[in-house]
Amino acid sequence: MDKILILDFGSQVTQLIARRVREAHVYCELHSFDMPIEEIQAFAPKAIILSGGPNSVYESDYQADPKLFELGVPVLGICYGMQFMAQTLGGKVESGDKREFGYAQIKARHHSKLLEGLQDQIDDAGNGFLDVWMSHGDKVTQLPAGFQVIAETPSCPYAAMADEARGFYGVQFHPEVTHTKRGTEMIHRFVLHVAGCKPSWTMPNYIDEAVKKIREQVGDEEVILGLSGGVDSSVAAALIHRAIGDQLTCVFVDHGLLRLNEGKMVMEMFAQNLGVKVVHVQAEADFMAKLAGETDPEKKRKIIGAEFIEVFDRESGKLTNAKWLAQGTIYPDVIESAGAKTKKAHTIKSHHNVGGLPEDMNLKLLEPLRELFKDEVRQLGVALGLPHDMVYRHPFPGPGLGVRILGEVKKEYADLLRQADAIFIEELRNTVDEKTGKNWYELTSQAFAVFLPVKSVGVMGDGRTYDYVVALRAVVTSDFMTAHWAELPYSLLGRASNRIINEVRGINRVVYDVSGKPPATIEWE
Protein backbone atom coordinates (compact mmCIF):
# COMPACT_ATOMS: atom_id res chain seq x y z
CA MET A 1 0.00 0.00 0.00
CA ASP A 2 1.32 3.43 -0.96
CA LYS A 3 1.96 5.76 2.00
CA ILE A 4 2.54 9.47 2.51
CA LEU A 5 4.62 10.75 5.45
CA ILE A 6 3.71 14.13 6.96
CA LEU A 7 6.35 15.75 9.18
CA ASP A 8 4.78 18.12 11.70
CA PHE A 9 6.60 21.35 12.56
CA GLY A 10 3.89 22.49 14.98
CA SER A 11 1.17 24.05 12.82
CA GLN A 12 -2.30 24.26 14.35
CA VAL A 13 -3.77 22.79 11.15
CA THR A 14 -1.38 19.93 10.37
CA GLN A 15 -4.13 17.37 10.98
CA LEU A 16 -6.00 18.89 8.05
CA ILE A 17 -3.15 17.89 5.72
CA ALA A 18 -3.63 14.28 6.76
CA ARG A 19 -7.39 14.61 6.29
CA ARG A 20 -6.93 15.88 2.74
CA VAL A 21 -4.53 13.06 1.86
CA ARG A 22 -6.91 10.44 3.29
CA GLU A 23 -9.76 11.97 1.27
CA ALA A 24 -7.79 10.93 -1.82
CA HIS A 25 -7.97 7.33 -0.47
CA VAL A 26 -4.24 7.30 0.21
CA TYR A 27 -2.87 6.22 3.59
CA CYS A 28 -0.71 8.69 5.48
CA GLU A 29 0.80 9.13 8.92
CA LEU A 30 1.77 12.27 10.79
CA HIS A 31 5.04 12.26 12.73
CA SER A 32 7.18 14.84 14.50
CA PHE A 33 9.60 16.85 12.35
CA ASP A 34 12.57 15.26 14.18
CA MET A 35 11.71 11.70 13.08
CA PRO A 36 15.08 9.95 12.57
CA ILE A 37 16.03 9.37 8.95
CA GLU A 38 16.32 5.62 9.61
CA GLU A 39 12.66 5.53 10.69
CA ILE A 40 11.65 7.56 7.64
CA GLN A 41 13.42 5.04 5.41
CA ALA A 42 11.77 2.13 7.23
CA PHE A 43 8.36 3.77 6.76
CA ALA A 44 9.13 3.86 3.01
CA PRO A 45 6.90 6.79 2.04
CA LYS A 46 5.92 7.34 -1.56
CA ALA A 47 6.26 11.08 -0.83
CA ILE A 48 6.81 13.45 2.10
CA ILE A 49 4.86 16.56 3.11
CA LEU A 50 6.47 19.16 5.41
CA SER A 51 3.89 21.07 7.47
CA GLY A 52 3.77 24.69 8.50
CA GLY A 53 4.87 25.84 11.93
CA PRO A 54 5.12 28.89 14.20
CA ASN A 55 8.91 29.10 14.29
CA SER A 56 11.69 30.50 12.13
CA VAL A 57 14.02 28.29 10.09
CA TYR A 58 16.87 30.00 11.94
CA GLU A 59 15.87 28.25 15.17
CA SER A 60 18.01 25.12 15.16
CA ASP A 61 15.58 23.23 17.41
CA TYR A 62 13.09 22.96 14.55
CA GLN A 63 15.11 21.29 11.81
CA ALA A 64 14.27 17.99 10.15
CA ASP A 65 17.06 15.71 8.91
CA PRO A 66 18.19 17.19 5.56
CA LYS A 67 18.86 13.65 4.28
CA LEU A 68 15.12 13.38 3.61
CA PHE A 69 15.78 15.30 0.39
CA GLU A 70 18.15 12.51 -0.71
CA LEU A 71 15.58 9.70 -0.53
CA GLY A 72 14.48 10.10 -4.14
CA VAL A 73 10.81 10.77 -3.32
CA PRO A 74 8.72 13.89 -4.03
CA VAL A 75 8.49 16.47 -1.23
CA LEU A 76 5.85 19.17 -0.70
CA GLY A 77 6.74 21.97 1.73
CA ILE A 78 3.88 24.06 3.15
CA CYS A 79 4.60 27.52 4.64
CA TYR A 80 7.42 26.81 7.15
CA GLY A 81 7.97 23.55 5.26
CA MET A 82 8.68 25.54 2.08
CA GLN A 83 11.10 27.82 3.94
CA PHE A 84 12.91 24.82 5.45
CA MET A 85 13.17 23.25 1.99
CA ALA A 86 14.52 26.47 0.45
CA GLN A 87 17.12 27.09 3.14
CA THR A 88 18.26 23.46 3.33
CA LEU A 89 18.74 23.19 -0.44
CA GLY A 90 20.76 26.42 -0.76
CA GLY A 91 18.19 29.19 -1.03
CA LYS A 92 17.66 32.12 1.34
CA VAL A 93 14.90 32.93 3.84
CA GLU A 94 14.49 36.34 5.46
CA SER A 95 12.02 38.15 7.66
CA GLY A 96 9.45 39.80 5.42
CA ASP A 97 8.80 43.56 5.26
CA LYS A 98 5.10 42.79 5.35
CA ARG A 99 3.56 39.88 7.20
CA GLU A 100 0.75 38.04 5.42
CA PHE A 101 -2.07 36.62 7.51
CA GLY A 102 -5.42 35.63 6.10
CA TYR A 103 -6.89 35.79 2.61
CA ALA A 104 -4.58 36.48 -0.33
CA GLN A 105 -4.58 36.11 -4.10
CA ILE A 106 -1.64 34.44 -5.78
CA LYS A 107 -0.79 34.81 -9.45
CA ALA A 108 0.29 31.57 -11.11
CA ARG A 109 3.52 31.71 -13.13
CA HIS A 110 4.99 29.15 -15.52
CA HIS A 111 3.53 25.70 -15.88
CA SER A 112 3.81 23.18 -13.07
CA LYS A 113 2.25 19.81 -12.35
CA LEU A 114 1.02 21.21 -9.03
CA LEU A 115 -0.87 24.31 -10.20
CA GLU A 116 -1.42 23.97 -13.95
CA GLY A 117 -5.07 24.55 -14.88
CA LEU A 118 -6.08 25.58 -11.35
CA GLN A 119 -7.51 29.08 -11.02
CA ASP A 120 -10.31 30.94 -9.27
CA GLN A 121 -10.16 34.04 -11.48
CA ILE A 122 -8.54 35.11 -14.77
CA ASP A 123 -7.59 38.73 -15.49
CA ASP A 124 -7.85 40.51 -18.86
CA ALA A 125 -4.31 39.48 -19.73
CA GLY A 126 -5.18 35.81 -19.25
CA ASN A 127 -3.30 35.38 -15.96
CA GLY A 128 -4.77 32.87 -13.53
CA PHE A 129 -5.29 33.80 -9.88
CA LEU A 130 -5.95 31.54 -6.89
CA ASP A 131 -7.66 32.47 -3.61
CA VAL A 132 -5.46 31.16 -0.79
CA TRP A 133 -4.86 31.46 2.95
CA MET A 134 -1.54 32.88 4.13
CA SER A 135 -0.01 32.85 7.61
CA HIS A 136 3.66 33.82 7.59
CA GLY A 137 6.19 36.48 8.54
CA ASP A 138 9.40 35.05 7.03
CA LYS A 139 9.63 34.48 3.29
CA VAL A 140 11.92 32.94 0.69
CA THR A 141 14.09 35.63 -0.95
CA GLN A 142 16.32 33.43 -3.12
CA LEU A 143 15.41 30.11 -4.73
CA PRO A 144 17.71 27.08 -4.46
CA ALA A 145 19.41 25.84 -7.63
CA GLY A 146 17.05 23.94 -9.92
CA PHE A 147 13.89 25.69 -8.68
CA GLN A 148 11.64 28.14 -10.49
CA VAL A 149 8.87 30.36 -9.17
CA ILE A 150 5.36 29.05 -9.93
CA ALA A 151 3.25 31.64 -8.03
CA GLU A 152 3.64 35.14 -6.58
CA THR A 153 1.85 37.90 -4.66
CA PRO A 154 2.73 41.62 -4.60
CA SER A 155 4.50 41.22 -1.24
CA CYS A 156 5.74 37.64 -1.73
CA PRO A 157 7.55 37.13 -5.06
CA TYR A 158 8.10 33.43 -4.30
CA ALA A 159 4.64 32.35 -3.12
CA ALA A 160 5.27 28.90 -4.62
CA MET A 161 8.32 27.19 -6.11
CA ALA A 162 9.07 23.95 -7.91
CA ASP A 163 11.92 21.69 -8.92
CA GLU A 164 9.93 19.48 -11.29
CA ALA A 165 12.87 17.17 -12.01
CA ARG A 166 13.09 16.05 -8.39
CA GLY A 167 9.40 16.46 -7.58
CA PHE A 168 10.09 19.14 -4.95
CA TYR A 169 7.39 21.77 -4.42
CA GLY A 170 7.00 24.57 -1.91
CA VAL A 171 3.92 26.72 -1.26
CA GLN A 172 3.94 29.68 1.12
CA PHE A 173 0.16 29.40 1.64
CA HIS A 174 -1.92 26.67 3.31
CA PRO A 175 -3.65 24.38 0.78
CA GLU A 176 -5.03 22.20 3.59
CA VAL A 177 -7.49 24.80 4.93
CA THR A 178 -10.90 25.34 3.34
CA HIS A 179 -10.15 29.05 2.77
CA THR A 180 -7.76 27.97 -0.01
CA LYS A 181 -10.51 27.09 -2.46
CA ARG A 182 -8.51 24.76 -4.73
CA GLY A 183 -6.24 23.52 -1.95
CA THR A 184 -7.65 20.01 -1.76
CA GLU A 185 -7.12 19.62 -5.52
CA MET A 186 -3.49 20.71 -5.10
CA ILE A 187 -2.84 18.14 -2.38
CA HIS A 188 -4.60 15.39 -4.32
CA ARG A 189 -2.62 16.33 -7.43
CA PHE A 190 0.65 16.06 -5.48
CA VAL A 191 -0.31 12.73 -3.91
CA LEU A 192 -1.89 11.03 -6.92
CA HIS A 193 -0.06 12.51 -9.92
CA VAL A 194 3.31 13.78 -8.71
CA ALA A 195 3.90 10.97 -6.19
CA GLY A 196 1.92 8.41 -8.21
CA CYS A 197 0.08 6.92 -5.24
CA LYS A 198 -2.71 4.44 -5.92
CA PRO A 199 -6.02 5.34 -4.18
CA SER A 200 -6.32 2.00 -2.36
CA TRP A 201 -7.10 3.26 1.17
CA THR A 202 -10.77 2.12 1.36
CA MET A 203 -12.96 0.84 4.18
CA PRO A 204 -13.41 -2.72 2.84
CA ASN A 205 -9.62 -3.00 2.51
CA TYR A 206 -9.15 -1.50 5.97
CA ILE A 207 -11.60 -3.95 7.57
CA ASP A 208 -9.84 -6.95 6.02
CA GLU A 209 -6.44 -5.70 7.17
CA ALA A 210 -7.67 -4.74 10.65
CA VAL A 211 -9.41 -8.09 11.25
CA LYS A 212 -6.27 -9.93 10.17
CA LYS A 213 -4.07 -7.75 12.39
CA ILE A 214 -6.33 -8.15 15.46
CA ARG A 215 -6.34 -11.94 15.07
CA GLU A 216 -2.55 -12.00 14.75
CA GLN A 217 -2.11 -9.74 17.79
CA VAL A 218 -4.60 -11.41 20.10
CA GLY A 219 -4.41 -15.05 19.09
CA ASP A 220 -6.72 -17.06 21.35
CA GLU A 221 -6.49 -14.63 24.31
CA GLU A 222 -9.43 -12.67 25.74
CA VAL A 223 -10.05 -8.93 25.36
CA ILE A 224 -12.03 -6.46 27.47
CA LEU A 225 -13.30 -3.10 26.27
CA GLY A 226 -14.89 -0.18 28.11
CA LEU A 227 -18.05 0.54 26.14
CA SER A 228 -19.25 4.13 26.61
CA GLY A 229 -22.02 4.24 24.04
CA GLY A 230 -20.04 6.78 22.02
CA VAL A 231 -19.12 6.28 18.39
CA ASP A 232 -15.44 5.39 18.90
CA SER A 233 -15.85 2.64 21.50
CA SER A 234 -18.91 1.27 19.69
CA VAL A 235 -17.10 0.95 16.36
CA ALA A 236 -14.04 -0.54 18.08
CA ALA A 237 -16.29 -3.14 19.75
CA ALA A 238 -17.96 -4.05 16.45
CA LEU A 239 -14.60 -4.39 14.65
CA ILE A 240 -12.97 -6.49 17.38
CA HIS A 241 -16.08 -8.68 17.68
CA ARG A 242 -15.94 -9.34 13.93
CA ALA A 243 -12.33 -10.43 14.33
CA ILE A 244 -12.47 -12.60 17.48
CA GLY A 245 -16.14 -13.04 18.42
CA ASP A 246 -16.70 -14.27 21.98
CA GLN A 247 -13.10 -13.61 22.99
CA LEU A 248 -14.31 -10.01 23.50
CA THR A 249 -16.18 -8.88 26.62
CA CYS A 250 -17.41 -5.30 26.88
CA VAL A 251 -17.91 -3.51 30.19
CA PHE A 252 -20.57 -0.81 29.96
CA VAL A 253 -20.38 1.59 32.91
CA ASP A 254 -23.59 3.63 33.33
CA HIS A 255 -22.43 6.64 35.35
CA GLY A 256 -25.81 8.34 35.35
CA LEU A 257 -24.57 11.04 32.96
CA LEU A 258 -25.71 9.50 29.67
CA ARG A 259 -28.33 10.76 27.25
CA LEU A 260 -31.98 9.68 27.58
CA ASN A 261 -32.38 5.89 27.16
CA GLU A 262 -28.76 5.55 26.03
CA GLY A 263 -28.00 2.64 28.33
CA LYS A 264 -30.98 0.69 27.01
CA MET A 265 -29.99 1.44 23.42
CA VAL A 266 -26.40 0.26 23.94
CA MET A 267 -27.51 -3.01 25.52
CA GLU A 268 -30.06 -3.69 22.79
CA MET A 269 -27.64 -2.95 19.96
CA PHE A 270 -24.62 -4.87 21.24
CA ALA A 271 -25.94 -7.61 23.50
CA GLN A 272 -29.13 -8.44 21.60
CA ASN A 273 -28.54 -7.44 17.97
CA LEU A 274 -24.79 -8.07 17.53
CA GLY A 275 -24.41 -10.84 20.10
CA VAL A 276 -21.52 -9.14 21.91
CA LYS A 277 -20.90 -10.13 25.53
CA VAL A 278 -21.65 -7.01 27.60
CA VAL A 279 -21.38 -6.57 31.38
CA HIS A 280 -23.73 -3.72 32.37
CA VAL A 281 -22.57 -1.88 35.51
CA GLN A 282 -25.00 0.53 37.23
CA ALA A 283 -22.68 3.02 38.91
CA GLU A 284 -24.71 6.24 39.10
CA ALA A 285 -24.62 6.39 42.91
CA ASP A 286 -20.81 6.02 42.97
CA PHE A 287 -20.25 8.83 40.47
CA MET A 288 -22.73 11.21 42.08
CA ALA A 289 -21.13 10.67 45.49
CA LYS A 290 -17.65 11.47 44.14
CA LEU A 291 -18.91 14.57 42.30
CA ALA A 292 -20.85 16.00 45.25
CA GLY A 293 -19.83 19.57 46.06
CA GLU A 294 -17.38 19.95 43.13
CA THR A 295 -17.96 22.89 40.77
CA ASP A 296 -14.64 23.24 38.92
CA PRO A 297 -14.99 21.89 35.33
CA GLU A 298 -11.48 20.45 35.07
CA LYS A 299 -11.75 18.75 38.45
CA LYS A 300 -15.13 17.30 37.48
CA ARG A 301 -13.60 15.81 34.34
CA LYS A 302 -10.78 14.25 36.34
CA ILE A 303 -13.14 12.88 38.99
CA ILE A 304 -15.31 11.27 36.32
CA GLY A 305 -12.24 9.85 34.55
CA ALA A 306 -10.73 8.47 37.76
CA GLU A 307 -14.02 6.95 38.92
CA PHE A 308 -14.61 5.38 35.51
CA ILE A 309 -11.19 3.73 35.68
CA GLU A 310 -11.84 2.55 39.25
CA VAL A 311 -15.20 1.00 38.37
CA PHE A 312 -13.88 -0.48 35.14
CA ASP A 313 -10.81 -1.86 36.93
CA ARG A 314 -13.01 -3.44 39.59
CA GLU A 315 -15.30 -5.10 37.06
CA SER A 316 -12.56 -6.13 34.66
CA GLY A 317 -10.71 -7.71 37.58
CA LYS A 318 -13.50 -10.27 37.71
CA LEU A 319 -12.65 -11.29 34.14
CA THR A 320 -9.50 -13.14 35.15
CA ASN A 321 -8.70 -14.56 31.71
CA ALA A 322 -8.48 -11.19 29.95
CA LYS A 323 -5.02 -10.35 28.63
CA TRP A 324 -5.89 -7.34 26.46
CA LEU A 325 -7.52 -3.98 27.10
CA ALA A 326 -9.15 -2.50 23.98
CA GLN A 327 -9.74 1.23 23.58
CA GLY A 328 -11.49 3.39 20.99
CA THR A 329 -8.45 5.66 20.61
CA ILE A 330 -8.55 7.47 17.26
CA TYR A 331 -5.82 9.25 15.30
CA PRO A 332 -6.41 12.80 16.62
CA ASP A 333 -5.98 11.40 20.17
CA VAL A 334 -2.64 9.89 19.15
CA ILE A 335 -1.49 13.14 17.52
CA GLU A 336 -2.58 15.31 20.47
CA SER A 337 -0.94 12.94 22.94
CA ALA A 338 2.34 13.09 21.01
CA GLY A 339 2.09 16.87 20.84
CA ALA A 340 1.58 17.11 24.59
CA LYS A 341 4.64 14.95 25.21
CA THR A 342 6.81 17.27 23.14
CA LYS A 343 5.26 20.36 24.78
CA LYS A 344 3.92 21.51 21.41
CA ALA A 345 0.28 21.46 22.46
CA HIS A 346 -1.56 23.36 25.19
CA THR A 347 -4.16 21.61 27.32
CA ILE A 348 -7.54 23.24 26.67
CA LYS A 349 -9.60 20.48 28.27
CA SER A 350 -8.28 17.16 29.53
CA HIS A 351 -9.47 13.94 27.89
CA HIS A 352 -10.90 11.65 30.57
CA ASN A 353 -10.02 8.46 28.69
CA VAL A 354 -6.51 9.17 27.41
CA GLY A 355 -3.54 8.33 29.56
CA GLY A 356 -4.72 7.58 33.12
CA LEU A 357 -4.83 3.80 33.03
CA PRO A 358 -3.76 1.98 36.22
CA GLU A 359 -0.13 0.93 35.98
CA ASP A 360 -0.82 -2.40 37.67
CA MET A 361 -3.53 -3.51 35.24
CA ASN A 362 -1.04 -5.81 33.52
CA LEU A 363 -3.01 -5.81 30.30
CA LYS A 364 -1.72 -5.36 26.77
CA LEU A 365 -3.28 -2.49 24.83
CA LEU A 366 -5.37 -3.04 21.67
CA GLU A 367 -6.29 0.12 19.73
CA PRO A 368 -7.70 -0.90 16.34
CA LEU A 369 -8.90 2.63 15.41
CA ARG A 370 -5.71 4.51 16.21
CA GLU A 371 -4.98 5.15 12.51
CA LEU A 372 -8.41 6.65 11.72
CA PHE A 373 -9.92 10.12 11.82
CA LYS A 374 -13.46 10.60 13.12
CA ASP A 375 -15.13 10.67 9.72
CA GLU A 376 -13.31 7.45 8.81
CA VAL A 377 -14.47 5.83 12.06
CA ARG A 378 -18.06 6.66 11.10
CA GLN A 379 -17.58 5.16 7.62
CA LEU A 380 -16.13 2.04 9.24
CA GLY A 381 -19.10 1.77 11.61
CA VAL A 382 -21.59 1.81 8.74
CA ALA A 383 -19.49 -0.73 6.82
CA LEU A 384 -19.58 -3.00 9.91
CA GLY A 385 -23.38 -2.83 10.01
CA LEU A 386 -23.95 -0.41 12.89
CA PRO A 387 -27.11 1.76 12.54
CA HIS A 388 -26.49 4.95 10.55
CA ASP A 389 -28.29 7.13 13.12
CA MET A 390 -26.08 5.78 15.90
CA VAL A 391 -22.80 6.14 13.98
CA TYR A 392 -23.60 9.68 12.79
CA ARG A 393 -24.81 11.02 16.12
CA HIS A 394 -23.36 14.32 17.18
CA PRO A 395 -20.23 14.21 19.37
CA PHE A 396 -20.84 13.58 23.07
CA PRO A 397 -18.15 14.39 25.67
CA GLY A 398 -16.51 11.55 27.56
CA PRO A 399 -17.68 12.90 30.95
CA GLY A 400 -21.20 13.04 29.51
CA LEU A 401 -23.72 15.40 31.05
CA GLY A 402 -21.20 16.05 33.82
CA VAL A 403 -19.76 18.91 31.76
CA ARG A 404 -23.12 20.09 30.46
CA ILE A 405 -24.34 20.75 33.99
CA LEU A 406 -22.64 23.97 35.06
CA GLY A 407 -21.31 23.84 38.58
CA GLU A 408 -22.14 20.96 40.91
CA VAL A 409 -23.53 17.77 39.37
CA LYS A 410 -26.65 16.34 41.00
CA LYS A 411 -28.96 13.50 39.95
CA GLU A 412 -31.89 15.92 39.91
CA TYR A 413 -30.06 18.19 37.45
CA ALA A 414 -29.02 15.27 35.22
CA ASP A 415 -32.61 13.99 35.02
CA LEU A 416 -33.93 17.43 34.00
CA LEU A 417 -31.16 17.97 31.45
CA ARG A 418 -31.61 14.52 29.89
CA GLN A 419 -35.27 15.24 29.14
CA ALA A 420 -34.63 18.76 27.81
CA ASP A 421 -31.79 17.56 25.59
CA ALA A 422 -33.91 14.75 24.13
CA ILE A 423 -36.72 17.17 23.24
CA PHE A 424 -34.31 19.57 21.53
CA ILE A 425 -32.74 16.77 19.47
CA GLU A 426 -36.18 15.41 18.56
CA GLU A 427 -37.29 18.81 17.27
CA LEU A 428 -34.09 19.15 15.22
CA ARG A 429 -34.69 15.73 13.64
CA ASN A 430 -38.37 16.48 12.95
CA THR A 431 -37.84 19.88 11.30
CA VAL A 432 -36.85 19.81 7.62
CA ASP A 433 -35.16 22.74 5.88
CA GLU A 434 -37.03 23.39 2.64
CA LYS A 435 -33.95 24.60 0.75
CA THR A 436 -31.81 21.51 1.34
CA GLY A 437 -34.41 18.84 2.10
CA LYS A 438 -32.37 17.83 5.16
CA ASN A 439 -33.48 17.96 8.77
CA TRP A 440 -31.79 20.37 11.15
CA TYR A 441 -30.01 17.60 13.07
CA GLU A 442 -28.19 16.74 9.83
CA LEU A 443 -27.52 20.41 9.09
CA THR A 444 -25.89 21.07 12.46
CA SER A 445 -22.55 19.58 13.51
CA GLN A 446 -23.32 19.44 17.22
CA ALA A 447 -26.41 20.33 19.24
CA PHE A 448 -27.29 19.88 22.90
CA ALA A 449 -28.86 21.41 25.99
CA VAL A 450 -26.92 22.86 28.93
CA PHE A 451 -28.24 23.00 32.51
CA LEU A 452 -27.70 26.35 34.26
CA PRO A 453 -27.71 26.17 38.07
CA VAL A 454 -29.75 29.36 38.41
CA LYS A 455 -33.47 29.86 38.92
CA SER A 456 -35.72 32.40 37.26
CA VAL A 457 -39.22 33.63 37.98
CA GLY A 458 -42.00 32.49 35.70
CA VAL A 459 -45.77 32.20 35.46
CA MET A 460 -47.57 28.95 34.69
CA GLY A 461 -51.35 28.88 34.88
CA ASP A 462 -52.34 31.23 37.67
CA GLY A 463 -49.25 30.55 39.75
CA ARG A 464 -45.75 31.94 40.07
CA THR A 465 -42.86 29.57 39.39
CA TYR A 466 -39.25 29.74 40.44
CA ASP A 467 -37.44 27.09 38.40
CA TYR A 468 -34.25 26.30 36.52
CA VAL A 469 -32.95 27.57 33.17
CA VAL A 470 -31.55 25.54 30.26
CA ALA A 471 -29.52 26.87 27.34
CA LEU A 472 -29.72 25.32 23.89
CA ARG A 473 -26.53 25.15 21.82
CA ALA A 474 -26.18 24.25 18.12
CA VAL A 475 -23.15 24.87 15.92
CA VAL A 476 -22.02 24.38 12.34
CA THR A 477 -18.39 23.48 11.66
CA SER A 478 -16.29 21.49 9.22
CA ASP A 479 -13.45 20.62 11.59
CA PHE A 480 -14.52 21.61 15.17
CA MET A 481 -11.48 23.90 15.36
CA THR A 482 -13.72 26.87 14.62
CA ALA A 483 -17.52 26.94 14.67
CA HIS A 484 -20.45 29.25 13.94
CA TRP A 485 -23.67 29.15 15.94
CA ALA A 486 -26.42 27.53 13.90
CA GLU A 487 -29.05 29.95 12.60
CA LEU A 488 -31.99 27.71 13.47
CA PRO A 489 -35.52 28.75 12.46
CA TYR A 490 -37.35 30.70 15.15
CA SER A 491 -40.28 28.30 14.78
CA LEU A 492 -38.03 25.35 15.68
CA LEU A 493 -36.59 27.15 18.70
CA GLY A 494 -40.09 28.17 19.76
CA ARG A 495 -41.40 24.60 19.62
CA ALA A 496 -38.39 23.24 21.49
CA SER A 497 -38.71 25.90 24.20
CA ASN A 498 -42.46 25.41 24.55
CA ARG A 499 -42.14 21.64 24.85
CA ILE A 500 -39.27 21.76 27.34
CA ILE A 501 -41.09 24.20 29.63
CA ASN A 502 -44.35 22.24 29.43
CA GLU A 503 -42.96 18.70 29.56
CA VAL A 504 -39.99 19.01 31.92
CA ARG A 505 -41.23 19.90 35.38
CA GLY A 506 -38.60 22.09 37.04
CA ILE A 507 -37.59 24.20 34.02
CA ASN A 508 -39.36 27.48 33.24
CA ARG A 509 -36.95 29.31 30.94
CA VAL A 510 -35.02 28.37 27.76
CA VAL A 511 -32.28 30.49 26.13
CA TYR A 512 -30.30 29.99 22.90
CA ASP A 513 -26.50 30.38 22.76
CA VAL A 514 -25.33 32.56 19.84
CA SER A 515 -21.58 32.45 20.58
CA GLY A 516 -19.06 31.37 17.96
CA LYS A 517 -15.80 29.47 18.47
CA PRO A 518 -13.67 31.43 19.06
CA PRO A 519 -14.12 33.20 21.42
CA ALA A 520 -16.32 30.58 23.11
CA THR A 521 -15.69 26.83 23.04
CA ILE A 522 -18.44 24.55 21.73
CA GLU A 523 -19.06 22.89 25.10
CA TRP A 524 -19.74 25.22 28.03
CA GLU A 525 -17.27 23.42 30.28
Curated annotation (Swiss-Prot):
GO molecular function: ATP binding; GMP synthase activity
Record-listed ATP binding positions: S228, G229, G230, V231, D232, S233, S234
Keywords, comma-separated and alphabetical: ATP-binding, Glutamine amidotransferase, GMP biosynthesis, Ligase, Nucleotide-binding, Purine biosynthesis
GO cellular component, one term: cytosol
Active site residues per record: C79, H174, E176
PROSITE patterns tied to this protein: GATASE_TYPE_1, GMPS_ATP_PPASE
Keyword Ubl conjugation tagged: no
Catalytic activity: XMP + L-glutamine + ATP + H2O = GMP + L-glutamate + AMP + diphosphate + 2 H(+)
HAMAP family: GMP_synthase
Disulfide bonding pattern of the chain: none
Every Glutamine amidotransferase type-1 domain range: 3-200
EC number: 6.3.5.2
Assembly mode: Homodimer.
Gene this protein is translated from: guaA
Entry protein name: GMP synthase [glutamine-hydrolyzing]
